[in-house]
């Protein structure tokens, strides 16, 4: 196999010319499709006989769009260069001023490399939201935020005081370090940091837009999703996942603009290779339309004179480490080390000065080249487009950081470097003002200001801008879930089954049904959802082009363009990205959808925690359902599947409301309240609810427990002479109930049993009360909900859950004046039966009894012989392994 950048020798130039002349003849008489067909036939002929063929998957290291196919630039380049200079300066100034006065820093080099990529888009392509058009969606590369603020300052949307408060948000007048809708809810639309989140969420956003159109929830408007990405972040697995879905789904509404400045945070992205060629091969293989913007217009004349192809060969020979180094040097160095390898190339630039050679730019810094790439991208049909734009990191920073490995961390520039920056971009800043680094904008009545405003007006308004005005939904009353509120009798069901029935009720609701978005990562049958296949269908952009194997069955695998289920395959990152798109639809599409993403709970927050955090940042509204939850509840799977900590992980996300219900009625109350809060009151929160695959009978909902269910705890059973308070959630609540019965039968100890539906919400309530009391020392102290529930009750508190002890420990600070015992499933999961696992992790009914007796004995309320009796009675192995140590 011949490597892509190798130069292959021609043994018979005459024969080669004859073949090329033949192809040229076909091109001129019958066009490119016929020529490509003939070439494909030749390749197929060879492969059929020899079984393999080395085919080049990359194109030469030159611009994809030739000069003779370029469109004339539609804007006033002189004015745009002027406004571009203002924005560049302001982006630099706000970082330098922040570093000078507060030390909070910022990044200069990324936007410096991408300024033209953004400005051409803002001036000519990015369409804002209007009354008749929903607007394009633009994902801004996180480290470019200073430039976006600099532009907003020129637009009059951000004040000088706000620029001075860059990265100083606590006072309420600052600007967030990166795009964060949670912190700037009227400005930023999409969180794109940490790196890799932008590509995958943008790709699934584009797919969700198509989903809405296929289901007739939104009209096709020709909207585009633009994602600005860095070449370094494309190494993230999420970035590569985005490649697959974009090509497979033929998302021609998606445009990736990859800023190939060849540098990541510490050094070159691919110092020993060519990152643009690598990306081209990846994206082309995935079915994307790739446009390379490598060289600025200054190279056109040289390439035209390159009759031998030696310049193109030299361009291919150099690796990215060379190209980065060239831009950290000067024109003389480039002449010697780039052109100087071959005498013919030195002759090619003999009439150029070193300064002229130095000014030969990268394609991403040439507005004309960038415009043509964008114009081709928006015209292209049937494929997503990826624009690979070569730039220089730190462009314009000169010796202070241009093309240097350290430029990502640069927060400061010396006086001479600032002066050089000013002179390079022709800005009018007096020498005596340089120390102040003033912000710049054109005069309000200037030609630049009028042009600048007119461009955005022509494109429909400002971008980015986040919109939230949307009509609240009409949700069903709790009585709609009457089946879940009733006693199941002897019929045993799981809470997962109860959820599927609740979902079925919602899908049939005349007001809400079509807005429900079920999302599953290839586990529908595990969760008992296969009945929905035929009922509402599985979404597929091409419908169903085959006869499914189970076509004769009632619940066959039905795919359709207007299918409602988003079946994501074994792809949790993609599934939650679809969920993020659906859960922010109210803002991005002016339509409130109700997404339910159900997954193995172990493969939720642990697997995609960064995306779950980003969902909170994006102000997502929706339901996450962690099925097969609990360390001991999922039988036979073991260490990697048994979840004993998803509630710990969900608890760290401030806007995530988490519940671990045991009974169907609890689940119905929680889901109904979640819909009220998110889709009627429009709170920017989302819900995480764990579901079980253990079947057992469910009681009817007792009177008056709704408030307790939602606040986090309520009494399930009470005894007037209760000596201890037993609490549990999820599957272990039933062990707590059984333990209460054993205590009464075997030891004549009475207890109250509490269903603790949300230890996380109880903790948050307790901390809120503590904070209020801290800040209001002269007022009557408030009491937490836990304290209110336990008021008038006696005895220690024993809490048992199917999660780590830390989960129960959340309420320890709010249990005052009594002993508190937490039982949990710390340690790695094991594969076994539920009964064995609960004994192994010491959360079964016998260990709950033992822990209760020990607490009572420690308080001097019973003798210690009772503890020993329990060990003997229940056959507890006191020498068993500590589950944490296994």
Question: Where does each model-flagged region fall?
Answer:
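Thiamine diphosphate
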Residues: 2, 168-191, 211-222, 240-440, ...
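N-terminal amphipathic, basic-rich helices that act as targeting or association modules
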Residues: 2-155, 421, 492-509, 513, ...
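Glycine- and acidic
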Residues: 5, 22-25, 72-80, 96-106, ...
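Cofactor-binding active-site loop characterized by glycine-rich and histidine/acidic residues
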Residues: 69-70, 74-87, 91-101, 107-249, ...
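Non-catalytic terminal/interface segments that mediate subunit docking, oligomerization
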Residues: 70-91, 111, 126-129, 136-137, ...
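Active-site metal-binding loops of divalent metal-dependent hydrolases
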Residues: 225, 230-233, 260, 391, ...
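Residue-level marker for buried hydrophobic side chains located in beta-strands
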Residues: 227-228, 256, 519, 625, ...
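A structural-propensity feature for long, helix-poor, extended segments
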Residues: 227-228, 234, 610-631, 636
């Amino acid at each position: 196999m011949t490597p892509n950048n190798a130069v292959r020798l021609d043994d018979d130039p005459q024969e080669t010319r004859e073949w090329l002349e033949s192809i040229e003849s076909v091109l001129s008489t019958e066009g490119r499709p016929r020529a490509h067909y003939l070439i494909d036939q030749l390749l197929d002929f060879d492969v059929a006989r020899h079984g393999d063929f080395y085919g080049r998957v990359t194109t030469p290291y030159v611009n994809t769009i030739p000069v003779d196919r370029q469109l004339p630039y539609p804007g006033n380049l002189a004015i745009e260069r002027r406004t571009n200079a203002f924005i560049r300066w302001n982006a630099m100034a706000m970082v330098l001023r922040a570093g000078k006065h507060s030390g909070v820093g910022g990044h200069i080099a990324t936007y410096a490399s991408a300024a033209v990529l953004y400005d051409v888009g803002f001036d000519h392509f990015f369409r804002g939201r209007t009354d008749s058009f929903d607007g394009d969606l633009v994902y801004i590369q996180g480290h470019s935020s200073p430039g976006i603020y600099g532009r907003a300052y020129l637009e009059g949307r951000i004040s000088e005081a706000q620029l001075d408060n860059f990265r100083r948000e606590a006072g309420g007048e600052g600007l967030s370090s990166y795009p964060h809708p949670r912190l700037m809810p009227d400005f930023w639309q999409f969180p794109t940091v940490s790196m890799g989140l932008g590509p995958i969420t943008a790709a699934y956003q584009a797919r969700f837009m198509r989903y809405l159109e296929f289901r007739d929830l939104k009209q096709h408007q020709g909207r585009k999703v633009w994602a600005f990405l860095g070449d370094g972040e494309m190494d993230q697995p999420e970035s590569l996942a985005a490649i697959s879905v974009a090509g497979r789904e033929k998302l021609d509404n998606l445009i990736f603009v990859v800023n190939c400045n060849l540098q990541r945070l510490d050094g070159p992205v691919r110092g020993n290779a060519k990152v643009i060629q690598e990306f081209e091969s990846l994206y082309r293989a995935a079915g994307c339309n790739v446009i390379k913007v490598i060289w600025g217009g200054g190279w056109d004349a040289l390439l035209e004179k390159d009759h031998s192809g030696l310049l193109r060969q030299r361009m291919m020979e150099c690796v990215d480490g060379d190209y980065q180094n060239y831009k950290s040097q000067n024109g003389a160095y480039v002449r010697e080390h780039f052109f100087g390898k071959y005498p013919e190339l030195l002759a090619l630039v003999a009439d150029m000065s070193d300064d002229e050679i130095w000014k030969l730019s990268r394609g991403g810094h040439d507005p004309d080249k960038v415009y043509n790439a964008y114009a081709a991208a928006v015209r292209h049909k049937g494929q997503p487009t990826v624009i690979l734009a070569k730039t220089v990191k730190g462009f314009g920073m000169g010796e202070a950081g241009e093309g240097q490995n350290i430029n990502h961390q640069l927060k400061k520039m010396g006086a001479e470097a600032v002066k050089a920056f000013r002179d390079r971009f022709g800005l009018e800043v007096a020498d005596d003002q340089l120390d102040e680094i003033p912000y710049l904008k054109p005069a309000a009545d200037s030609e630049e200001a009028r042009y600048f405003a007119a461009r955005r007006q022509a494109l429909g308004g400002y971008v980015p801008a986040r919109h939230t005005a949307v009509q609240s939904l009409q949700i069903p009353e709790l009585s709609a879930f009457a089946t879940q509120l009733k006693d199941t009798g002897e019929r045993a069901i799981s809470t997962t089954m109860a959820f599927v029935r609740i979902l079925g009720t919602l899908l049939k609701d005349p007001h809400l049904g079509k807005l429900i978005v079920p999302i599953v990562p290839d586990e529908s049958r595990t969760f008992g959802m296969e009945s929905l296949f035929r009922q509402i269908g599985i979404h597929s952009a091409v419908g169903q082009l085959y006869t499914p194997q189970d076509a004769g069955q009632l619940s066959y695998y039905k795919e359709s363009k207007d299918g409602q289920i988003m079946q994501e395959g074994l792809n949790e990152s993609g599934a939650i990205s679809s969920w993020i798109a659906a859960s922010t639809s109210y803002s991005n599409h002016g339509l409130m959808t109700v997404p339910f993403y159900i997954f193995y709970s172990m493969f939720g927050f642990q697997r995609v925690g960064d995306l779950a955090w980003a969902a909170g940042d994006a102000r997502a509204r929706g339901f996450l359902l962690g099925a097969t939850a609990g360390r001991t509840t999922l039988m036979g799977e073991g260490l990697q599947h048994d979840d004993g900590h998803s509630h710990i992980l969900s608890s760290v996300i401030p806007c995530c409301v988490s519940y671990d219900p045991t009974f169907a009625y609890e689940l119905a109350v929680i889901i109904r309240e979640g819909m009220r809060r998110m889709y009627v009151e429009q709170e920017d929160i989302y819900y995480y609810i764990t579901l079980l695959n253990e079947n057992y009978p469910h009681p009817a909902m007792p009177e008056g427990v709704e408030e307790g269910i939602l606040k986090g705890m309520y009494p399930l059973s009470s005894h007037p002479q209760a000596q201890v308070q037993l609490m549990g959630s999820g599957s272990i609540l039933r062990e707590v109930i059984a333990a209460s019965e054993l205590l009464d039968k075997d030891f004549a100890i009475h207890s109250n049993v509490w269903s603790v539906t949300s230890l996380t919400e109880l903790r948050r309530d307790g901390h809120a009360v503590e904070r209020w009391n801290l800040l209001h020392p002269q007022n009557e102290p408030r009491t937490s909900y836990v304290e209110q529930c336990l008021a008038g009750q006696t005895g220690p508190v024993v809490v048992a859950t199917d999660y780590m002890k830390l989960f129960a420990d959340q309420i320890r600070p709010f249990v005052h004046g009594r002993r508190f015992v937490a039982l949990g499933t710390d340690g790695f999961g094991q594969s076994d039966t539920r009964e064995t696992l609960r004994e192994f992790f010491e959360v079964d009914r016998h260990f709950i009894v033992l822990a209760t007796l020990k607490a009572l004995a420690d308080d001097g309320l019973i003798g210690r012989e009772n503890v020993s009796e329990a060990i003997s009675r229940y056959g507890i192995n006191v020498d068993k392994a500590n589950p944490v140590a296994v």
